[in-house]
């Protein structure tokens, strides 16, 4: 994998491009022949889509990045990083973790990848804690309801 020193932070993915900017990127891809357009044009379009606030755009961005990953071994490092961000934004945290773990495996000293890995792991942990809290609340409500029903029948 190539060693490029700059990758955007996760927070950068939340500064969405406006629809005109995304359309310019899309037109660039179409002008170059769509699926046969340059990897760079498709990559730029995919990153613009991932940054979108629209889930369908984000999903298309992830699909394009997946295609580029398969097609271009030279862009795999970048694709793993951006795929992690795309899946994170879509709430697909286990998939994001797979991508970032693969990147960190190849580049264990990459500080940006390590920071992204921490963010993904923290999100997975917080989602797990929320799930446990919801289950606990459900059990407590169920137990209270059963207790009230039993108490009501004793009267």
Swiss-Prot record:
Cytoplasmic topological domain residue ranges: 1-130
GO BP term, pick one: mitochondrial fission
SUPFAM superfamilies noted in UniProt: TPR-like (SSF48452)
Record InterPro entries: Fis1, Fis1_cytosol, Fis1_TPR_C, Fis1_TPR_N, TPR-like_helical_dom_sf
Annotated transmembrane regions: 131-150
TPR repeats: 77-110
Membrane-side (Mitochondrial intermembrane) residue stretches: 151-155
Membrane disposition: Single-pass membrane protein
Major location (coarse): mitochondrion
Keywords: Membrane, Mitochondrion, Mitochondrion outer membrane, Repeat, TPR repeat, Transmembrane, Transmembrane helix
Keyword Secreted: no
Family statement drawn from the similarity comment of this UniProt entry: Belongs to the FIS1 family.
Function per UniProt: Has a role in mitochondrial fission. Has a role in outer membrane fission but not matrix separation.
PANTHER family hit by this protein: MITOCHONDRIAL FISSION 1 PROTEIN, TETRATRICOPEPTIDE REPEAT PROTEIN 11 TPR REPEAT PROTEIN 11
Swiss-Prot/TrEMBL domain comment: The C-terminus is required for mitochondrial localization, while the N-terminus is necessary for mitochondrial fission.
Protein known as: Mitochondrial fission 1 protein
Encoding gene, per UniProt annotation: FIS1
């Amino acid at each position: 994998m190539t060693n490029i020193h700059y990758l955007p932070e996760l927070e950068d993915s939340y500064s969405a491009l406006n629809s005109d900017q995304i359309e310019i990127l899309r037109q660039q891809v179409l002008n170059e022949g769509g699926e046969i357009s340059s990897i760079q044009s498709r990559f730029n379009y995919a990153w613009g889509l991932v940054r979108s606030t629209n889930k369908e755009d984000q999903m298309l961005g992830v699909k394009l990045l997946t295609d580029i990953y398969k097609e271009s071994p030279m862009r795999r490092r970048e694709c793993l990083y951006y795929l992690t961000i795309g899946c994170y934004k879509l709430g697909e945290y286990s998939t994001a973790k797979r991508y970032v773990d693969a990147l960190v495996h190849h580049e264990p000293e990459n500080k940006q990848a390590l920071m992204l890995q921490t963010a993904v792991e923290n999100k997975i942990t917080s989602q797990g804690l929320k799930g446990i809290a919801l289950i606990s609340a459900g059990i407590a409500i169920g137990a209270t309801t059963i207790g009230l029903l039993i108490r009501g029948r004793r009267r």
